[in-house]
Amino acid sequence: MVNVGINGFGRIGRLVLRNALQMQILTVVAVNDPFLDVEYMAYLFKYDSVHGRYQGKVETKDGKLIIDGHKIAAFAEREPANIKWADCGAEYIVESTGVFKTEELAKEHLKGGAKKVVITAPGSGVPTYVVGVNLDKYDPKEVVISNASCTTNCLAVLAKVINDKFGIVEGLMTTVHATTATQKTVDAPAKKDWRSGRSVTNNIIPASTGAAKAVTKAIPDLEGKLTGLAFRVPTLDVSVVDLVVRLEKETSYDDVKKAMRDAADGKHPGIEKGIVDYTEEDVVSTDFVGSNYSMIFDAKAGIALNSRFMKLVAWYDNEWGYARRVCDEVVYVAKKN
C-alpha cells in the first residue's frame, strides 16, 4: 500500500479520498485543511450533493477522521512546511488546495517528511503528466509533478488518439464546463475577469481556459496547433469537450469512431483500458456522474464537414473522473520509486 497525505479537503481532495478507499491501493493517512476542523471534515466527506452520501461509517475520535475503522490524521496548517507528514507516514502528497502550484511552493511539503508531491491543477514550471498520454515519460528524480486539469485530461486523450491515427493540423476546443467552487452564486466583484463574477446559477459564462495549450505539455507535437475557451454553465458536475479539428489524412467519421472504439478496448498504444469509453447512446450530462473515465467519446454528437474537418465531442466527470486519475498517477509514481 502507498501512504498518501491530502493537502486541501475541497471537492477534489474529498473525492481523491473516496476513490482511494474504493481502489484499495492507496492508504490516505493524513488530511490537512486550515479552514476545517475534523468534525466538519467528516460532515463534508459523508454528505455530497453530487455523488451522494458515503455508504460506509464516518466518525471522529481524538482529533482523527475515522472512515470504516481506518484512522486518518487531521491537520489544520496554513503552510505546507508545517504539516507533520512524517508523523503519520505520509510519503506521497496530493496537493489539492489550488494554491501551491509551483515547484518551489509544493516542495515545502518535503520539510514535513513527504517524498513526492502531485499537484491537482496545471502547475507553473512543473513537469506535467496525463495518464494514458505521457505518464510513461515520468522521471523518478522529479519530486513535484502536475496531473494537469480535468479538461486537459479529457482533451489530451482525445487529441492523442486523433493525432496518432490521422494527424492534427490545427484545432479549436470548447469545454462546456460545470460549476466550480470559485464561481459566484450571485453577481459579485471579480477584478481579474469581470464576467466570472456573474451569478453561476442563471448564466452561461464565457471564460478562458489553458487546457488546450496545456495539452502540448503532454503532446509536444501539438505545440501551436491547439487553443480553446470555456463556457461555464449552471450544472453541478460533468463537462463536455467540443473539439473541431483539421486533419492531415483524409478519413471518414466512421474511421474516427473505430479509432475511439479501439482506444476504449485498450487497443491504442499507450492507453490502457479504463481511460477511454465510447457510446452511441442518447446520453446527457448526468449520465456520466461518477464515471471513472478520462474521456467518453460521444459518437452520435460528433459530425464531419468533410474528410479532413470534423467536430468531435467527449464527456468527462470533471470531479470524480479527475480524482480517479490523480489516484492512478500517485500509484504510478510510487511504483516507479
Curated annotation (Swiss-Prot):
Species in which this protein is naturally found: Agaricus bisporus
Subunit and interaction comment: Homotetramer.
Name assigned to this protein: Glyceraldehyde-3-phosphate dehydrogenase 1
Residues that, per the record, bind D-glyceraldehyde 3-phosphate: 149-151, 180, 209-210, 232
Positions of the record's site feature: Activates thiol group during catalysis: 177
GO cellular component, one term: cytosol
Annotated catalytic residues: 150
Protein family (similarity comment): Belongs to the glyceraldehyde-3-phosphate dehydrogenase family.
Cellular compartments annotated: Cytoplasm
Segment forming the signal sequence: none
Lineage: Eukaryota, Fungi, Dikarya, Basidiomycota, Agaricomycotina
Chain positions recorded as NAD(+) binding sites: 11-12, 33, 78, 318
Entry superkingdom: Eukaryota
Record keywords: Cytoplasm, Glycolysis, NAD, Oxidoreductase
